[in-house]
Amino acid sequence: MDVMQAAGLIPATPPAPVLVAYSGGMDSAVLLHALAATDGYREAGLRAVHVHHGLHADADAWALHCQQQCADLGIALQVVRVQVARDSGSGLEAAARAARHAAFAATLAAGEWLALAHHRDDQAETFLLRALRASGPDGLAAMRPQRPFGPGTLWRPLLGHARADLAAYAQAHAVRWIDDPSNTDPQHERNFLRTQVLPALQQRWPLAADALARSAQLCGDASTLLHDDDVNLLPTVCNSAGALELQPLRSHSPARRARLLRAWVAAAHAPPLPAQGVHALEREIATTQPDRQTCFAWQQTEIRRWRQQLYLLSARATWPAQWQAEWNGDSTLLLPDGAQLQLRGTPGLRFEQPLQVRARQGGERIVLPGRTHSHQLKHLLQQSDLPPWERTRLPLLWAGKTLLAAGDQIVSAKLDQWLRAHAARLQWRSAAPAN
């Protein structure tokens, strides 16, 4: 039994079909070799993927090396070429990682497990990086052994092994690999920790990497317990529409409120809420002014306050001020921000004459059912339960110079009579919010 299986880190029975992320480096080469040496993985459909970033002059040669090694092992390999955004603002290393993970998610089959070759030394480096960024328990948990990923599961079976264990395996089994010179460039934060900091720590404390990895595991345990509490508490501070209610939120401590805010955002599959967002929203929670309206925006997402509630929204395209369209009601009208306008009734129903649909300009007036005089649309909308950011996106229906409706929220006497006569109604579907 080899050193990998002896430690029980590669189960003899595969948990699912496995896709190995194979860079060609020593770590992934050892992982691929160890899995290929176990018949159960082959029978379950073991395969590999190599991401060609195109960032190094030898990238083509590395892809060819991976193809040759997989051919020798009898393992199917898929080479995926990606374009790395050099102007992403997050740095080339982060951009390459994002492109790589997107390629993994696109390649992974439903129910398949993506095996990554991260080991204990990698875990220690990640823990230090997160600590230097002032992370809490969630961040200090570093890399989890497994978690949901794309259509399958991300799996790190080697987290309990030291880099030295992998090197010993590679030597014992004559595993061939390639060396990426960028992995030793101290300009990269992780490489600096790997080549400068950890060796110094291990010279003074030989088990430093083990201790740091163990601390990450303990933080992971604490994070799991806190997450369970978040899941149980979140329904007590959310309303049926998914908005956060400020009053019950105020009953919790600032630390718990911060966790609930992040859990609320995560539950909507929105980008993680940054620290400055937590601080900004904490000020909102502390302010009890009933008519206060504010917005915090990040990564095409925004949180807005209205009527003692917080709403999580996806950023949407603005309406061109002069936008207009003709619509006879026989098909769905797609609006500039992704919303839809429909005439619901008997099949084939349409207006006798096409109506004009326009964006709000201000100053509009409308005659309501049962009234003989007109009202300012602005005042009617202020009295409604429609949030202010939705009011500005209402499509206005006109017949010449007569305002007939503002979405499906306010309908004129004339259009209301026509809809009743045809057993019909307007339906305005706002673009889906994040929550």
Swiss-Prot record:
The keyword Calcium does not apply. GO terms for molecular function: ATP binding; tRNA(Ile)-lysidine synthase activity. Its EC number is 6.3.4.19. GO terms for cellular component: cytoplasm. It is found in: Cytoplasm. It is an enzyme of class 6 (ligase). ATP binds at S23, G24, G25, M26, D27, S28. It catalyses: cytidine(34) in tRNA(Ile2) + L-lysine + ATP = lysidine(34) in tRNA(Ile2) + AMP + diphosphate + H(+). It comes from the Bacteria. Keywords: ATP-binding, Cytoplasm, Ligase, Nucleotide-binding, tRNA processing. Pfam families: ATP_bind_3, TilS, TilS_C. One of its GO terms (biological process) is tRNA modification. Its main location: cytoplasm. NCBIfam families: lysidine_TilS_C, lysidine_TilS_N. Ligates lysine onto the cytidine present at position 34 of the AUA codon-specific tRNA(Ile) that contains the anticodon CAU, in an ATP-dependent manner. Cytidine is converted to lysidine, thus changing the amino acid specificity of the tRNA from methionine to isoleucine. The N-terminal region contains the highly conserved SGGXDS motif, predicted to be a P-loop motif involved in ATP binding. Belongs to the tRNA(Ile)-lysidine synthase family. This is tRNA(Ile)-lysidine synthase. It comes from Xanthomonas campestris pv. campestris (strain ATCC 33913 / DSM 3586 / NCPPB 528 / LMG 568 / P 25). The lineage of its organism: Bacteria, Pseudomonadati, Pseudomonadota, Gammaproteobacteria, Lysobacterales. The gene is tilS.
